[in-house]
Curated annotation (Swiss-Prot):
SUPFAM superfamilies in the record: Translation proteins
Similarity annotation: Belongs to the universal ribosomal protein uL3 family.
Matches recorded under InterPro entries: Ribosomal_uL3, Ribosomal_uL3_bac/org-type, Ribosomal_uL3_CS, Transl_B-barrel_sf
Residues carrying N5-methylglutamine: Q151
UniProt name for this protein: Large ribosomal subunit protein uL3
Length: 246
């Protein structure tokens, strides 16, 4: 089980696939997503990584969090979240996860907070049909009607669909397809809509109900791996040039 990521919702747009079909996508951005803490079986009883993303001003960060970030030598983060991982996918503190953590065609589960709608009636909140517009109806056109029974059971059952607060709840949408990624700009494009307003923080994980593709990076798509590959190639090139000069 790999770690998820924290992304910021930028909005929606559309792209075209190889067949020329228009695909609506939501654009998610990874900005400075780093591991800031570990949870191990020996110390905590489970394995997980704590991620921080974005940037926050020091003056707007609590003293406790300032000490937490200073302990691991990272800048204050705007958002923190914890992801359960298997022991073999545990990441080192300070590791930065990039958009290459996911691959096109992969299915992911996306979690966000839906847009709040305030106090809503049953027609908007539960898609009720409403009452008749005329023929004896008086000021009950959008009412929900009867809410209970007679003396037995003499109560309104829990879960009864009625008017009330709508939205502003945690919503997880499963099995969303990753259309494409842009590692340089830190963008992940997923098919369809994602709960949350523009600028909202979104949690993206590997889908639990779909198999993981074979070509996903393990333990994660991290920026340090790319640097190590570059450093390994550079000395070989310099050596070969020196031998040629001799």
């Amino acid at each position: 089980m790999r770690s998820g990521v924290i992304a910021q919702k930028l909005g929606m747009t559309r792209v075209y696939n190889d067949a020329g079909e228009h695909v609506p996508v939501t654009v998610l951005r990874l900005e400075n997503c780093q591991v800031i803490a570990q949870r191990t079986i020996e110390k905590n009883g489970y394995t997980a990584v704590q991620l921080g993303v974005g940037f926050a001003k020091v003056k707007n960060t609590s003293r406790a969090l300032r000490g937490h970030f200073a302990k691991v030598s990272v800048e204050p983060k705007a958002k923190i979240a914890e992801f359960r991982v298997s022991p073999d996918n545990l990441l080192d503190i300070g590791t930065e996860i990039t958009a290459q953590h996911f691959v096109p065609g992969q299915r992911v589960d996306v979690t966000g907070t839906s847009i709040g709608k305030g106090f809503a009636g049953v027609m908007k909140r539960h898609n009720f049909g409403g009452h008749r517009a005329s023929h004896g109806n008086s000021i009950t056109h959008r009412a929900h009607g009867s809410t209970g029974q007679c003396q037995d059971p003499g109560k309104v059952f829990k879960g009864k669909k009625m008017a009330g607060h709508m939205g502003q709840v945690r919503v997880t949408t499963q099995n969303i397809e990753v259309v494409s990624t842009d590692v340089e700009r830190g963008l992940i494009l997923v098919r369809g809509a994602v709960s949350g307003s523009k600028g909202a923080w979104i949690l993206v994980r590997d889908a639990v109900k779909r198999p993981l593709p074979d070509n996903v990076p393990r333990p994660a798509g991290i920026r340090q791996l790319a640097k190590e590959k570059t450093e390994m190639v550079t000395p070989v090139t310099e050596t070969s040039e020196a031998e040629g000069a001799e």
